[in-house]
């Protein structure tokens, strides 16, 4: 499950 913090890293 991708965490919200990982999403920020993608951006």
Swiss-Prot record:
<dbReference type="GO" id="GO:0045202">
    <property type="term" value="C:synapse"/>
</dbReference>
<dbReference type="GO" id="GO:0007218">
    <property type="term" value="P:neuropeptide signaling pathway"/>
</dbReference>
<comment type="similarity">
    <text>Belongs to the tachykinin family.</text>
</comment>
<keyword id="KW-0964">Secreted</keyword>
<dbReference type="GO" id="GO:0005576">
    <property type="term" value="C:extracellular region"/>
</dbReference>
<dbReference type="InterPro" id="IPR013055">
    <property type="entry name" value="Tachy_Neuro_lke_CS"/>
</dbReference>
<keyword id="KW-0527">Neuropeptide</keyword>
<protein>
    <recommendedName>
        <fullName>Substance P</fullName>
    </recommendedName>
</protein>
<dbReference type="GO" id="GO:0007268">
    <property type="term" value="P:chemical synaptic transmission"/>
</dbReference>
<keyword id="KW-0027">Amidation</keyword>
<comment type="function">
    <text>Tachykinins are active peptides which excite neurons, evoke behavioral responses, are potent vasodilators and secretagogues, and contract (directly or indirectly) many smooth muscles.</text>
</comment>
<keyword id="KW-0529">Neurotransmitter</keyword>
<feature type="modified residue" description="Methionine amide">
    <location>
        <position position="11"/>
    </location>
</feature>
């Amino acid at each position: 499950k991708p965490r919200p913090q990982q999403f920020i890293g993608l951006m």
